[in-house]
Amino acid sequence: MFNPQLNKNGELQHLLTIEGLPKANILHILDTASSFVSIGDREVKKVPLMRGKSVFNLFFENSTRTRTTFEIASKRLSADVINLNIQASSSSKGESLLDTIDNLSAMHADMFVVRHAQSGAPYLIAKHLSDTSQSHVHVVNAGDGRHAHPTQGLLDMYTIRHYKKDFSNLTVAIVGDILHSRVARSDIHALTTLGVPEIRAIGPRTLLPSGLEQMGVRVFTDINKGLKDVDVIIMLRLQNERMSGALLPSAQEFFKSYGLTTERLALAKPDAIVMHPGPMNRGVEIESAVADGTQAVILPQVTFGIAVRMAVMSILAGN
């Protein structure tokens, strides 16, 4: 049976989702990332771990942080980076996803970093590579539909560990549009695997997916109750591009009911940290006083994201 992520030795072959990824693999990625964080402070920000390797970035959806940090991470590992312009590629002329992959593989690709609107697209690519005896080529999921965003989940775990040191006594709240969020799904799976005892999902009923309670998540529709004594707050934007129908009265009403203000932040523990995967919409899910405040670790998340993505690619490349 095709194993989507691990080889027969239990080593990472692709990174497609955090769901089902063993704790040992997650911790290995986080520990490896720790060794890469300081590279950004060096005069020469490079290590030769992927010299001679070709990394193809295939972003079928828009991205700023993920695409840029993957490119920086690849270059800091000394890989050759090819950014495919999807709008100008043959996929805009009707070429199928797998035909695109086959043609790029013929150019001796070593790794594909893929963001796609369709859930499961990275898995499809990984299976195709396995079926066509190209198991030496690795796939990293940079976000697929509403399904998963594993590197964001991993960098969120790195950030939490950096500031809180230990997962075993934490209460983590995820607030906002959880229904459409691949980040929320990846974070919930990672937090569960790492032993976080209490995960809370906070949002209006229309933006909370079914099945959260079965995953061990406590659900709150009252943000004031949900934020009480939490250690970590992960804010999520409204994903209007994925919404169909009127799920909310307005962005202003959402902020009034669920926006993170200084008053609401005060309900959390005094040393609580505030996170956000971006892009951030000020005045919708978070006010500027909180986003720019001392408890926000939103920009460090971006910095840590480079190291985490370096770790993932380095491990996949066999280092």
Curated annotation (Swiss-Prot):
Superkingdom to which the source organism belongs: Bacteria
Protein name: Aspartate carbamoyltransferase catalytic subunit
Biological function: Catalyzes the condensation of carbamoyl phosphate and aspartate to form carbamoyl aspartate and inorganic phosphate, the committed step in the de novo pyrimidine nucleotide biosynthesis pathway.
Single GO term (MF): amino acid binding
Chain sites annotated for binding L-aspartate: K93, R182, R237
Family stated for the protein in its record: Belongs to the aspartate/ornithine carbamoyltransferase superfamily. ATCase family.
Xref: InterPro entries: Asp/Orn_carbamoyltranf_P-bd, Asp/Orn_carbamoylTrfase, Asp/Orn_carbamoylTrfase_sf, Asp_carbamoyltransf, Asp_carbamoyltransf_Asp/Orn-bd
The UniProt record lists the keyword Transferase: yes
Residues where carbamoyl phosphate binds: R65, T66, R115, H149, Q152, G278, P279
First-tier enzyme category under EC: transferase
Recorded catalytic activity of this chain's protein: carbamoyl phosphate + L-aspartate = N-carbamoyl-L-aspartate + phosphate + H(+)
GO terms, biological process: 'de novo' pyrimidine nucleobase biosynthetic process; 'de novo' UMP biosynthetic process; amino acid metabolic process
Pfam hit, one: OTCace_N
Species for this entry: Janthinobacterium sp. (strain Marseille)
Pathway: Pyrimidine metabolism; UMP biosynthesis via de novo pathway; (S)-dihydroorotate from bicarbonate: step 2/3
Subunit description: Heterododecamer (2C3:3R2) of six catalytic PyrB chains organized as two trimers (C3), and six regulatory PyrI chains organized as three dimers (R2).
Alphabetic keyword roster: Pyrimidine biosynthesis, Transferase
The enzyme's E.C. designation: 2.1.3.2
